[in-house]
Amino acid sequence: MINKAILGGTFDPIHNAHINVAYEALERFNLEEVIFIPAGNPPHKIKLKKTPAHIRYEMVKLAIEKETRFSISDFEIKSKDLSYTYRTLKHFKEKEPETNWYFITGEDCLSYLEHWKYIDEIFNICNFVIFSREGFKGKEEIIKKKKSMLLKYGKEILFMDASILDISSTKIRNRIKEGKEVSFYMPDKVYKFILQNNLYK
């Protein structure tokens, strides 16, 4: 069976930690492909100001262009509807029903996972991969807490201790506003694109 993963995010901007997570997932779960999906209108970030979708899409495209096992989808940014995870996963599952799908997300999502829209359908579509920084505490407690939910859907939450740097898109945006160096946080082409388009100032 073919294994593929979806890695969604606002990617505002995409940075090296996103890339590292994708590479570690490729190796850990024997994936044929990781699909990066820039968020369109995520319901939990409606009120937050975001860089236009086509610009975020272009940055992701530049960041992953040399890796043949990475691809990008404009599924969410083409839609005017809210970007619910269920809708996105359903789209890809219907396109490739025989593929074993993984959904990669951060440890911060665990605390409210059961409140996601259509969470029961989501568990039927994919395997959850939670990436956490090395030394993340509370993993055992969370697994215990979610045990009944996992038994109900017959799926397990897979943890991946990603060797990621202390980087966040928010940190990068703030450093740019403050006139600080950020080139070492992202692929060179993304950095040049940000400079050329005078972003985040």
From Swiss-Prot:
Class in the EC hierarchy, top level: transferase
InterPro entries per record: Cyt_trans-like (IPR004821), NadD/NMNAT (IPR005248), Rossmann-like_a/b/a_fold (IPR014729)
EC numbers for this chain: 2.7.7.18
Alphabetical UniProt keywords: ATP-binding, NAD, Nucleotide-binding, Nucleotidyltransferase, Pyridine nucleotide biosynthesis, Transferase
GO BP annotations, alphabetical order: NAD biosynthetic process
Catalytic activity: nicotinate beta-D-ribonucleotide + ATP + H(+) = deamido-NAD(+) + diphosphate
GO MF term list: ATP binding; nicotinate-nucleotide adenylyltransferase activity
Keyword NAD: yes
Entry-linked PANTHER family: NICOTINATE-NUCLEOTIDE ADENYLYLTRANSFERASE-RELATED, PHOSPHOPANTETHEINE ADENYLYLTRANSFERASE
Function of the protein: Catalyzes the reversible adenylation of nicotinate mononucleotide (NaMN) to nicotinic acid adenine dinucleotide (NaAD).
NCBIfam families on file: cyt_tran_rel, nicotinate (nicotinamide) nucleotide adenylyltransferase, PRK00071.1-3
Protein's name in the database: Probable nicotinate-nucleotide adenylyltransferase
UniProt organism field: Clostridium botulinum (strain Loch Maree / Type A3)
